[in-house]
């Protein structure tokens, strides 16, 4: 079975949370908690989803490149919306005990390239923050006061382009430390560590969902914009310019609506120019421009 009933490959689905998970043992508690079913199991990257709960998940396997590729595959396969949140959750090594603690990675550094990423808005009331180093092979030295994983840098390089950096999150649960060797990690332990944090994960998702809804509203296209585009046959280039200037115009004149009668004999470029002039003449906040 490669598809679950109700999930169509070519439809634009309404997923709020997109999970990119390295290991099946890490994914299993999330799949169960959010009632996800298999959507795609014939490719390198298995996908699970539940449109009703708003969750989609891809299992990437280990490695930064695989994480980036799996995120891209999930985005394209399910036609994920631009307002969805992207979350990389999994186990990580840490420089101190205990295992089982959960952290938000507020800075992710690729040990291989030195590139640094700063994913997500801080969820300081819910989870502590830590720096995370993405390495190409398991880290046993714990030389830095930081988390260690093998995927997050690749995820952080790709995922923000699907939504925005503020909706890109890296959450890690400590699985090994200098006093708890990575050689002791089992599938059962991995699953247990994540299951114990499910209530806190749910609280984190509640906060992220607020941001998702805000972004959805920001990206929504008002009916009057669609009416103008249909009436005046905007090219794709002019459509983009029109939507951008409309957004600024609406910030400047929040109580006004576009009056079709003012533009009956106008061309798309003339409509854009008229709105630009009104914004320039009346904008009180220079950030609007």
Where are the language model's segments positioned?
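Glycine-rich phosphate- or other oxyanion-binding loops that anchor nucleotides, phosphorylated ligands
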Residues: 42-289
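A short, well-structured beta->alpha microelement
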Residues: 2-5, 38-47
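Extreme N-terminal starter segment of soluble prokaryotic enzymes
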Residues: 11-18, 55
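N-terminal beta1-alpha1 ligand-phosphate binding loop
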Residues: 16-37
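Short, low-complexity, intrinsically disordered N-terminal peptides in bacterial proteins
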Residues: 1-14, 287-289
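Short amphipathic alpha-helical "recognition" segments used for binding
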Residues: 7, 30, 280-282
């Amino acid at each position: 079975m490669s598809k679950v009933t109700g999930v169509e490959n070519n439809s634009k689905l309404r997923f709020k949370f997109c999970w990119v998970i390295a290991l099946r043992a890490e994914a299993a508690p999330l799949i169960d908690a959010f009632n996800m079913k298999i959507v795609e199991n014939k490719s390198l990257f298995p996908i699970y989803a539940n449109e009703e709960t708003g969750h989609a998940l891809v299992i990437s396997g280990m490695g930064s490149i695989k994480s980036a590729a799996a995120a891209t595959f999930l985005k394209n396969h399910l036609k994920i919306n631009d307002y969805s949140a992207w979350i990389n959750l999994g186990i990580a090594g840490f420089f101190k005990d205990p295992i089982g603690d959960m952290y938000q990675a507020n800075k992710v550094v690729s040990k291989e390239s030195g590139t640094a990423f700063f994913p997500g808005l801080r969820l300081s009331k819910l989870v502590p923050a830590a720096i995370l180093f993405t390495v190409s092979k398991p880290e046993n030295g714990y030389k830095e006061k930081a988390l260690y994983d093998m995927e997050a840098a690749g995820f952080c390089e790709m995922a923000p382009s699907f939504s925005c950096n503020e909706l890109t999150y890296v959450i890690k649960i400590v699985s090994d430390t200098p006093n708890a060797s990575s050689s002791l990690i089992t599938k059962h332990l991995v699953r247990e560590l994540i299951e114990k944090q499910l209530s806190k994960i749910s609280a984190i998702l509640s906060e992220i969902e607020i941001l998702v809804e805000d972004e959805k509203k920001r990206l929504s296209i008002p009916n009057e914009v669609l009416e103008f585009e249909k009436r005046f046959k905007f090219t794709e280039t002019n459509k983009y310019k029109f939507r951008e200037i409309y957004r600024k115009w609406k910030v400047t004149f929040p109580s006004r609506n576009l009056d079709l009668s003012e533009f009956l004999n106008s061309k798309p470029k003339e409509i854009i120019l008229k709105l630009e002039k009104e914004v320039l003449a009346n904008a009180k906040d220079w950030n609007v421009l």
